[in-house]
C-alpha cells in the first residue's frame, strides 16, 4: 500500500488541492508534484523496458559464439550503461518528488472544522464543575454557550498561578532564573517540586495500567530523524539545536518514540504498539514572544508524560479515541474541569490529520487553557521515517499510522491546580488522586500546600 498523499496525487489531485485549501496553503505545490510524478512514471517505464531488454540479451549470450557473441556482449555493455544512467535519472526525480511531497501537510480528516486559525476551533464536550468568579460569569457563559455546563459562582477573585507561585506560596522564582538563564525559565521549590513528580508518577502509573510500555527515550535526535518526525522547516525556530553537533533537543517524548522504528518494518500482528514516554521537553517558544510572560505556563523546559501508538491504518481512529479518553480520565481523576476542542484545519499543524485539545478552565484568567494535545498523524510521519508494517499472510506492506497525546505536562498542570485548588487564604489543596504518591515521602505535602512566611530566594 502506498502513501496516502501519493495515492491522492495520482488518483484525485483536485481533492489534494482542496485539502491544502482547507489549511490555507498554496495549491500550486500539487501541480508541481503531479508533473514530477508523471515524469517519474514515464522514466520508470523506460527503466523497466531497458531492464527487460538487457535480461533478454544476457540470456542469449551463453548460447552464442565467435563474433556474434562478442557483438552481443558489447551491445549488452552499452545497454547496461544506458540503463544505469536512466536509473540515476529515475532516482533523482524520485528524490525531488518525495522532497516536494514531504513539504505537504497531512490530509485533513473530513470531520475537522474548516477555518484558518484557532478562532474556528469547536468545543465538543465539557466536563466537571467550573468555579467562576462573580465578575466573570458573563464571559464564562460566552465561552460555554449552549453547553448547559455545571458551575458555581465564587465571590472572591482567585489569584493567577504566577502570583500564587511567587507572591503567595513563595515556592517559585522566575526573576532569578531569568537573570541566569533568560526568560521562561524558573526555580521551583519544595512542595511544588513534589507536586511536579507526583503528577508524573500518577500519569505513568495510570497509563501503564492501560497496557502501555513505559519508556525513557533519548533526549536528543539527529537532524535526519527530527526532520522526519516534524516539519523542521516550520518548527526550526521552536526547537533547540546543539551548536556544532547534528543533534536537536526533543520538544516531547513523541519525537524519540516515533523514531523508535526508523527505517524498519513491523510485523502487522504485533500492532498496535503502545508506549508511555517520560522525558523533559525543551522548547524555544519563539512564536510566543508576548504570550504568558509571567509564571510557568509557557516555558522553555518542563517534564512531560506522552502517550504514543503505532497502529494499522484501519484501527488508527479507534486508538485516537482511546488516547483522548485516557487523557480525560487523568484530568477527571485530578478533578480539573475542562473542555475538549476539535481543532480547525488551519490550526492543526502539518503532522496531524485531526487533533483534539483538552483545555482546563482557569478561574483566575477566566479562560480555558490547553493542557493536552491529541493527534492522529495517520501515515505522515511513517512515510517520512520509512516505517512500514508487513502482513506476511496476505503478502502486503504498508505504512503504519502514528498517534500521540499528552498524558501530563507537569508545569501546565501545576498552573491549573494552583488556580482551581486555591482557597481564599492562599492555601492550595492537593488533588486527592496525587496523595498516595506523596505519602511515602516524609517531607512531601500530604493534603495541603501552605504559603511560606518568607521567600527561599
UniProtKB/Swiss-Prot annotation:
Q: In which pathway does it act?
A: Aminoacyl-tRNA biosynthesis; selenocysteinyl-tRNA(Sec) biosynthesis; L-seryl-tRNA(Sec) from L-serine and tRNA(Sec): step 1/1
Instruction: Name one molecular function that GO assigns to this entry.
Output: serine-tRNA ligase activity
PROSITE patterns recorded: AA_TRNA_LIGASE_II
Q: Which GO terms describe its biological process?
A: selenocysteine biosynthetic process; seryl-tRNA aminoacylation
Q: Print the keywords alphabetically.
A: Aminoacyl-tRNA synthetase, ATP-binding, Cytoplasm, Ligase, Nucleotide-binding, Protein biosynthesis
User: Which E.C. number(s) belong to this protein?
Assistant: 6.1.1.11
Please give the superkingdom of this protein's source.
Archaea
Reaction it catalyzes: tRNA(Ser) + L-serine + ATP = L-seryl-tRNA(Ser) + AMP + diphosphate + H(+); tRNA(Sec) + L-serine + ATP = L-seryl-tRNA(Sec) + AMP + diphosphate + H(+)
Localization: Cytoplasm
Recorded GO CC terms: cytoplasm
Binding residue positions for ATP: 283-285, 299, 370-373
Residues reported to bind L-serine: 252-254, 306, 406
| Enzyme class, UniProt record, top EC level | ligase
Q: What does this protein do?
A: Catalyzes the attachment of serine to tRNA(Ser). Is also able to aminoacylate tRNA(Sec) with serine, to form the misacylated tRNA L-seryl-tRNA(Sec), which will be further converted into selenocysteinyl-tRNA(Sec).
**Family, per entry:** Belongs to the class-II aminoacyl-tRNA synthetase family. Type-1 seryl-tRNA synthetase subfamily.
From the Swiss-Prot or TrEMBL record, give the protein name.
Answer: Serine--tRNA ligase
Q: Which organism is it from?
A: Saccharolobus islandicus (strain Y.G.57.14 / Yellowstone #1) (Sulfolobus islandicus)
Amino acid at each position: 500500500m502506498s502513501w496516502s498523499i501519493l495515492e491522492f496525487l495520482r488518483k484525485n489531485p483536485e481533492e489534494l488541492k482542496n485539502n491544502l485549501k482547507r489549511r490555507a496553503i498554496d495549491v500550486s505545490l500539487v501541480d508541481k508534484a503531479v508533473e514530477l510524478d508523471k515524469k517519474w512514471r514515464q522514466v520508470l517505464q523506460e527503466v523497466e523496458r531497458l531492464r527487460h531488454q538487457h535480461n533478454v540479451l544476457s540470456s542469449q549470450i551463453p548460447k552464442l559464439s565467435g563474433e556474434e557473441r562478442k557483438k552481443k556482449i558489447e551491445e549488452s555493455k552499452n545497454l547496461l550503461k544506458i540503463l544505469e544512467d536512466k536509473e540515476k535519472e529515475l532516482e533523482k526525480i524520485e528524490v525531488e518528488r518525495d522532497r516536494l511531497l514531504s513539504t505537504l501537510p497531512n490530509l485533513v480528516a473530513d470531520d475537522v472544522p474548516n477555518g484558518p486559525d484557532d478562532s474556528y476551533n469547536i468545543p465538543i464536550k465539557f466536563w466537571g464543575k467550573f468555579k467562576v468568579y462573580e465578575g466573570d460569569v458573563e464571559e464564562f457563559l460566552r465561552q460555554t454557550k449552549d453547553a448547559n455546563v455545571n458551575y458555581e459562582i465564587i465571590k472572591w477573585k482567585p489569584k493567577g498561578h504566577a502570583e500564587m507561585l511567587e507572591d503567595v506560596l513563595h515556592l517559585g522564582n522566575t526573576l532569578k532564573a531569568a537573570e541566569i538563564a533568560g526568560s521562561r525559565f524558573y526555580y521551583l521549590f519544595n512542595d511544588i517540586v513534589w507536586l511536579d513528580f507526583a503528577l508524573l508518577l500518577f500519569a505513568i502509573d495510570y497509563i501503564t495500567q492501560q497496557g502501555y510500555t513505559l519508556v525513557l527515550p533519548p533526549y536528543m535526535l539527529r537532524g535526519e530523524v527530527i526532520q522526519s518526525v516534524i516539519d523542521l522547516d516550520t518548527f526550526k525556530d521552536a526547537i533547540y539545536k546543539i551548536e556544532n553537533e547534528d543533534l536537536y533537543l526533543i520538544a516531547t517524548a513523541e519525537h524519540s518514540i516515533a523514531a523508535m522504528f526508523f527505517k524498519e518494518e513491523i510485523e502487522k500482528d504485533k500492532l498496535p504498539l503502545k508506549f508511555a514516554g517520560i522525558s523533559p521537553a525543551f522548547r524555544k517558544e519563539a512564536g510566543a514572544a508576548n504570550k504568558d510572560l509571567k509564571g510557568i505556563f509557557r516555558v522553555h523546559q518542563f517534564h512531560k508524560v506522552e502517550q504514543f501508538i503505532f497502529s494499522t491504518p484501519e484501527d488508527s481512529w479507534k486508538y485516537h479515541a482511546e488516547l483522548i479518553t485516557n487523557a480525560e480520565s487523568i484530568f477527571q481523576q485530578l478533578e480539573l474541569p475542562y473542555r475538549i476542542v476539535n481543532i480547525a484545519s488551519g490550526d492543526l499543524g502539518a503532522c496531524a490529520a485531526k487533533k483534539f485539545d483538552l483545555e482546563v478552565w482557569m478561574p483566575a484568567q477566566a479562560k480555558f487553557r490547553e493542557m493536552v494535545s491529541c493527534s492522529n498523524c495517520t501515515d505522515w510521519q511513517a512515510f517520512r521515517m520509512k516505517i512500514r508494517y508487513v502482513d506476511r499472510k496476505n503478502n502486503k506492506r504498508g505504512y503504519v499510522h502514528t498517534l500521540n497525546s499528552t498524558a501530563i505536562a507537569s508545569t501546565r498542570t501545576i498552573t491549573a491546580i494552583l488556580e482551581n485548588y486555591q482557597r481564599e487564604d492562599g492555601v492550595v489543596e492537593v488533588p486527592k488522586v496525587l496523595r498516595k504518591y506523596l505519602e511515602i515521602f516524609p517531607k512531601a505535602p500530604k493534603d495541603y500546600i501552605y504559603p511560606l512566611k518568607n521567600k527561599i530566594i
